[in-house]
Amino acid sequence: MEELQGYLEKDRSRQQPFXYPLLFQEYIYALAHDRGLKGSLFYEPTEVFGYDSKSSLALVKRLIIRIYQQNDFTSVVNDSNKNQFVNHHHNNFGYSHFYSQMISEGFAILVEIPFSLRLVSYFEKKEIPKSHNLRSIHSIFPFLEGKLXHLNYVSDILIPHPVHMEILIQILQCWIQDAPLLHFXRFFLHKXHNWBRFLXTPKESXYVFSKXNKRLFRFLYNSYVSECEFLLVFLRKKSSYLRLTSFGLFLERRHFYVKMEHLQMQHLILIVVCLDYXQGTLWSFXXXXXXXVRCQGXVVLASKGTHLLMKKWKYNFVNLWQYHFHFWYQSYRIHINQLSNYSLYFLGYLSSLLRNSSTVRNQMLENSFLIDTVTNKLETLVPVIFLIGSLSKAQFCTVSGHPISKPIWADLSDFEIIERFGRMCRNLSHYHSGSSKKQELHRIKYILRLSCARTLARKHKSTVRTFLRRLGSVLLEEFFTEEEQVLSLILPKAIPFTFYGSHKERIWHLDIIRINDLVNHS
């Protein structure tokens, strides 16, 4: 355990003190309002009741004054817990809600500063060619294809949640030495509204992703997940004496700016990267006998060893977890399965090993014999049932997959309705371009196409058949434009188009930096 502590302290040697005084500087809130450092983080501006953006600077100055006054500041935080729909408190809530959000955003900027400096220093010391390619979610599947086919066992690990607030404060304390800032964070997190269910399961606490706390939530969650990665890295280093140069290629994904850039939350309907609860954050390492991948709150650990070896990994991880975080880790969160008989649901794909056997007849002089060869291939399939469940939750079809209209879109123009449905279909096709059987997407396309027709018919008080006849060619062009035709405009013309026409070819893209909404909604 002392060795683990020394390993962690070595990585945290560059702590940043004296961040609390910056909380009283106006430019910190200007950074928060302007998407933070270099605009790399997702941010949604605040709407204050009865005020425009021009008056926000005056409100920020008033906020700084109230922070100096302890009693006044306490009332600001407590007022944010009041019901925003109470009419006689309408204006007071406008102030309180704005103050609470600005404090949250300003604090997020402050705690991000040490990690942004660390990331810049990391890239200055170590240049990684084409590191931008590693940012794609799809980049992890070629890694899995090359590794899982030679491994025997796989463990699914769920990172524990919810997390007690004091654990998050202790994690920040490891990186930040500024005691006043830590006390401020503890006070704010315990007083602010909705934090009693912080880091609950994403399907039970979608309201946590409010405009007021989204940025700070993502930062704290990533700091927590980063500590989990420390434990896996420590076990990896102690389980093998082989030093892998490829490990560094993936390590930069741990840094917060790279993570949080992918952690955008486009809709409350879903994201997340997991339980991220946030989007497409990937991390992995490989050894001669083990490989591990993490996305959001799910970790996949595969090994070529025995079932006993996987159990040792499991109990070592559980013991280190309980020692480091000081709370119980339920062992049932880790499932060990034989890879040959297991389908792994990961990043919107059902992945399993497909055994291919081939027989070769070998003739040597007068003797002939048969050679049987068995190879394992990673098969990635589209989970149609899960996608239909997502479409059902989003009210595009029934639970059984029967298309229905989308009433809330009926007020849009015909062009916008068709464009929205078509964009969903194209995004799904793009995200699942790595599927071994792309025909499975045809049913999803059919549901979206017929749902679009029903929505248009509902808007114009007509029949579905009428709109299918009238807009048949337009709908076909929107929903059934094959991805190969798009690729033909991108790839060199010298390659015959028949190459793109094959439905058996899996294509992994390097521009997908977040999990598809419908995939994560299931």
UniProtKB/Swiss-Prot annotation:
The free-text function statement in the UniProt record for this protein reads: Usually encoded in the trnK tRNA gene intron. Probably assists in splicing its own and other chloroplast group II introns.
Parts forming coiled coils: none
Q: Which organism is it from?
A: Iris danfordiae
Which protein is depicted?
Maturase K
Keyword field contains Plastid:
yes
Pfam families in UniProt: Intron_maturas2 (PF01348), MatK_N (PF01824)
Which GO biological process entries does UniProt record here? mRNA processing; RNA splicing; tRNA processing
Locations listed in the record: Plastid, Chloroplast
Primary place of residence? Answer: plastid
PANTHER family (UniProt xref): MATURASE K
List cellular component terms (GO): chloroplast
Q: Which GO terms describe its molecular function?
A: RNA binding
Q: Which UniProt keywords apply?
A: Chloroplast, mRNA processing, Plastid, RNA-binding, tRNA processing
| Lineage, top ranks | Eukaryota, Viridiplantae, Streptophyta, Embryophyta, Tracheophyta
What family does the entry list? Belongs to the intron maturase 2 family. MatK subfamily.
Q: Which domain of life is it from?
A: Eukaryota
